[in-house]
């Protein structure tokens, strides 16, 4: 899974794109 939006990041657990909250990453 590739996230193109800079506000999203790929979750290593669910392998889906999720929204980033500041410096909080999954």
Curated annotation (Swiss-Prot):
Main location: secreted
Signal peptide (residue range): none
Entry GO MF terms: toxin activity
GO CC aspect terms: extracellular region
Keywords, alphabetical: Disulfide bond, G-protein coupled acetylcholine receptor impairing toxin, G-protein coupled receptor impairing toxin, Neurotoxin, Postsynaptic neurotoxin, Secreted, Toxin
Tissue and organ expression note: Expressed by the venom gland.
Compartment(s) where it occurs, according to its Swiss-Prot or TrEMBL record: Secreted
Main function: Antagonist of muscle and neuronal nicotinic acetylcholine receptors (nAChR) with highest affinity for neuronal alpha-7/CHRNA7 nAChRs.
Quaternary context: Homodimer; non-covalently linked.
Similarity-based family: Belongs to the three-finger toxin family. Short-chain subfamily. Orphan group VIII (haditoxin) sub-subfamily.
Protein known as: Muscarinic toxin-like protein 1
Organism: Naja naja
Species lineage: Eukaryota, Metazoa, Chordata, Craniata, Vertebrata
């Amino acid at each position: 899974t590739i996230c193109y939006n800079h506000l999203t990041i790929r979750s290593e657990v669910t392998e889906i794109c999720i929204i980033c909250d500041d410096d909080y990453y999954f």
